[in-house]
């Protein structure tokens, strides 16, 4: 499964702009938004249109790396994990370029996992990132055919944003995390971090999109999929914060 995720990530990145190209600002991230809800709405509109580059451009990428206080963040976390630390500004200009690329790639990999979770064919154990044995003749063909048949991106074309739900209504514990979010914002070098919950209609069914957004000065960017509220709700990291209302 890990090899499959790597292959999907390579395809995603091949379809995305090179560093410093592709968006209106000449960067991987877009110009930012006037509110957290606008940032999430732009992400969902791009998702509906099957526009991966547009989805990723709603996130803080260059700004994320440029404003991050690596020492403060490591002190907050209390541990250095290479898989996380690679997106932190740890060195000079070269390493910062690497951190930007890693940040972009990790977001793309999260979207690859989300697509796989919701496209997963029937007849297999639930998707959890584990390997799937395809050792018999015809296994690979059947597996790929199942993924193609269940292509979640086709369903997402029917997505409509109905409105937004206050995260406190989703979990009474959200307000208790205000100090934790403030410490995170301080180490990230942003002014504010909030969770956003968008209420969606997808093919006549009610869904929610949970994610965190960050304010840098007057501009808002999406910060992370799932986000603080998603963790409180117990959402799978593979979900990318997208969950049917029936799951609650």
List the predicted regions and their residue ranges.
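Peptidyl-prolyl cis-trans isomerase
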Residues: 67, 186, 206-208
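Surface-exposed, charged secondary-structure patches
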Residues: 73-203
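Short beta-strand edge/turn micro-motifs at domain boundaries
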Residues: 26, 124-125, 138-142, 150, ...
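Short low-complexity, flexible loop/linker segments enriched in glycine and/or proline
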Residues: 71-72, 238
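Short, low-complexity N-terminal intrinsically disordered segments enriched in polar/charged residues
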Residues: 19-49, 54-57, 61-68, 75-82, ...
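Hydrophobic beta-strand residues in large extracellular and virion-surface proteins
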Residues: 40-43, 194-200, 211-213, 220-222
């Amino acid at each position: 499964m890990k090899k499959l995720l790597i292959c999907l990530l390579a395809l995603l990145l091949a379809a995305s702009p090179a560093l410093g190209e592709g968006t209106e600002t000449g960067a991987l991230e877009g110009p930012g938004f006037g509110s957290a809800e606008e940032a999430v709405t732009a992400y969902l509109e791009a998702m509906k249109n099957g526009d991966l580059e547009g989805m990723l451009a709603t996130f803080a990428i260059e700004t994320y790396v440029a404003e991050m206080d690596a020492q403060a963040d490591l002190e907050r976390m209390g541990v250095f994990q290479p898989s996380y630390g690679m997106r932190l500004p740890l060195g000079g200009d070269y390493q910062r370029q690497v951190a930007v690329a890693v940040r972009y790639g990790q977001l793309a990999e999260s979207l690859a996992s989300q697509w796989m979770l919701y496209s997963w064919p029937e007849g297999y154990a639930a998707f959890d990132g584990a390997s799937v044995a395809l050792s018999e003749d015809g296994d690979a063909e059947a597996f790929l055919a199942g993924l193609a048949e269940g292509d979640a991106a086709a369903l997402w074309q029917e997505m409509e944003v109905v409105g937004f739900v206050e995260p406190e209504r989703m979990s009474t514990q959200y307000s208790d995390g205000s100090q934790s979010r403030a410490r995170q914002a301080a180490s990230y070098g942003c002014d504010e971090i909030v969770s956003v919950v968008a209420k969606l209609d997808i093919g006549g069914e009610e869904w929610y999109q949970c994610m965190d957004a960050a304010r840098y000065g007057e501009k808002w960017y999406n910060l992370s999929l799932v986000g603080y509220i998603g963790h409180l709700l117990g959402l799978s990291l593979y979900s990318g914060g997208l969950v049917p209302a029936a799951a609650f």
